[in-house]
């Protein structure tokens, strides 16, 4: 009898805890997420990333991004929340570096004079859980200063005559690299 009562108390506590977990309201993300779909040659490319703003979500104050919020010389998750994902259904090259078909996490290693795009084999992790041993390649990106600032981080794949250009834009800076189907 005593063990039945204990079992019922434990069962009731578990049910109550489970219902509290499911009843929690999901809050909207501070940084919206975006899926970029592009076709380069015959390759279908998808990039999923969080898009943080220049303004601090709590104070509303404008932040210095490059060399501030995103420090030079430190790996950045390239967006907000989970690691940014790149999926390609065909082998491609970015900045002349070959990448086989598959899904990868993208990171950025910014410096004052440029940046390196890091293509990492580990996926599904929170953006700050970077494991350098899983790096597939590091690709040099071109840096360009923009005439007008961009308030929200953006990733785009823009078509060119035959291939495309990967562009990462935020604040007053754009990083880019050619993207093509691997031949």
Q: What do the predicted segments below correspond to?
A:
Residues 74-125, 129:
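Mid-length scaffold segments of soluble, non-membrane domains
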Residues 19-23:
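Sec/Tat signal peptide C-region and signal peptidase I cleavage site
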Residues 24-74, 123-183:
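Primarily secretory-pathway and cell-envelope proteins
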Residues 1-10:
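Bacterial N-terminal signal peptides that target proteins for export
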